[in-house]
Amino acid sequence: KASVGFKAGVKDYRLTYYTPEYQTKDTDILAAFRVTPQPGVPPEEAGAAVAAESSTGTWTTVWTDGLTSLDRYKGRCYDIEPVAGEESQFIAYVAYPLDLFEEGSVTNLFTSIVGNVFGFKALRALRLEDLRIPPAYSKTFQGPPHGIQVERDKLNKYGRPLLGCTIKPKLGLSAKNYGRAVYECLRGGLDFTKDDENVNSQPFMRWRDRFVFCAEAINKAQAETGEIKGHYLNATAGTCEEMMKRAIFARELGVPIVMHDYLTGGFTANTSLAHYCRDNGLLLHIHRAMHAVIDRQRNHGMHFRVLAKALRMSGGDHVHAGTVVGKLEGERDVTLGFVDLLRDDFIEKDRSRGIYFTQDWVSMPGVLPVASGGIHVWHMPALTEIFGDDSVLQFGGGTLGHPWGNAPGAVANRVAVEACVQARNEGRDLAREGNEVIREASK
C-alpha cells in the first residue's frame, strides 16, 4: 500500500493560523473582527478559523498545500483581546499578506475578507470593526474622482458647509414638476438638490426626461444667482452599461455632478463610474442605501467605517455619513471617527472613537461627508460645530416643508448656515448660543 503522506481528518485551525508572535508588516492588510464563538470554542481557535477561512485555509490538509508556501500567503490571527463587559466576545486581529488581493479591486478585497467567514458554524456572530489599508495597497486605487479641494475650486465656494436638499415626494412627481422644485430650491440659495436614492427610471418619470428638466432648472438658477449650482442626477441603473449611458448623457448636458447608490449598485459598477467621472470632470455623489442591512447589528456584519474606507478607495466625492444630532454622545465620537477617515490624510488609532488602526491615506483625495435625514434649520448650529466646513448638509423635508414654500425654505437654510459660520468665526459658542444665533438671523 502507498505510504501515507499526511493524516486525513479535521485539523485545528489554531495550529497553523494562530501566531501571537507574528510582527505585522507595513504592507499587511490588518482587520479587527468582533468574534462571538459558539459555546465551547476557544478564542484562539475561533480567531484562527476566521484568519484561515478568509485566506488560504480549508477544513483539512490538502495535497496541494505542498505546492505553495502557506507561510507566505496565509492570513494570521496575531492578537486576541477581550471586549469589556462582554463574557463571550473578543476582538481578533488578523493580518493578511498583500499578495492575497487584486490591485485596485474593492470587490476582491471584500470577497476575500468578508466573503465566506460570516456563515461559519463555529461562530455565533462576527463583525468586521475596522480595516487597516496599507499605502502599498491604497496606491493601487484611483480613489475619489476629485476630492474636497478640487470640488471647492470647481464650485467656487469656500469657508462654509455646502447645502443640499432631497426633492420630495421622492416618488410620483412628473419630470417637469420635479424640475420646478429643483429650480426653486437652487434659486433660494442651496448649492445642490438631490435625486432620492430610489429615483432611477420609473414609469411616472423616465430618467432622460428628469435629466433634461433638471439641467434646465440648474441653468436658470445659475443665471439668476451668479453661483454654480448642481443637482445629483442618479445614474444608478440595472446594468453597468445603462449606468454609464446615464452618466454620459449628464456630461453632455453640462451638469457638474452625478450620483450613485454604491452598495446596491455594487463596488465594481461604482469604481467604473468613479473612473469615468474623473476622466470627464464630473463630481460623484454617493448614497449608502442598504448600509444598515450590513452595519446595524452591533455584533454581526460590518461597521460603517469599513464601508466608508471602501468607498474612499472605490471612489466618490460625497458620501452619506449619518447626522449625529439628537443621538447619544458616544455615537458622536464614533461618527466623527469615520468622518475623519473620509476627509483626512492621516488618522491616528483611537479606540474611544472606534478607530482600531492608524490609517495613512498618503495623498488620496478626501470625501465630503453628507449629513442627511430628519435634520432642519434648528439643527444648523450643532451640525456646523460637529461637521465643520468640509461637509454637505442636506435638508429634504427641512427645506420643502417650509410653510411658505420651497424657495423660502432654501433661503432659511442658507441664511442659517451663513449666520452659524459667522458666529463661529467670531468666537461665539454655537452649542450654547445656537438658537439665539438663528433667531437673530431670521429677523
Curated annotation (Swiss-Prot):
Post-translational modification comment from the UniProt entry: The disulfide bond which can form in the large chain dimeric partners within the hexadecamer appears to be associated with oxidative stress and protein turnover.
Modification N6-carboxylysine, positions: K194
Source superkingdom: Eukaryota
Residues of the site described as Transition state stabilizer: K327
GO CC term, one of those recorded: chloroplast
Molecular function GO labels: magnesium ion binding; monooxygenase activity; ribulose-bisphosphate carboxylase activity
Subunit-level organization: Heterohexadecamer of 8 large chains and 8 small chains; disulfide-linked. The disulfide link is formed within the large subunit homodimers.
Protein known as: Ribulose bisphosphate carboxylase large chain
Protein source organism: Abies firma (Momi fir)
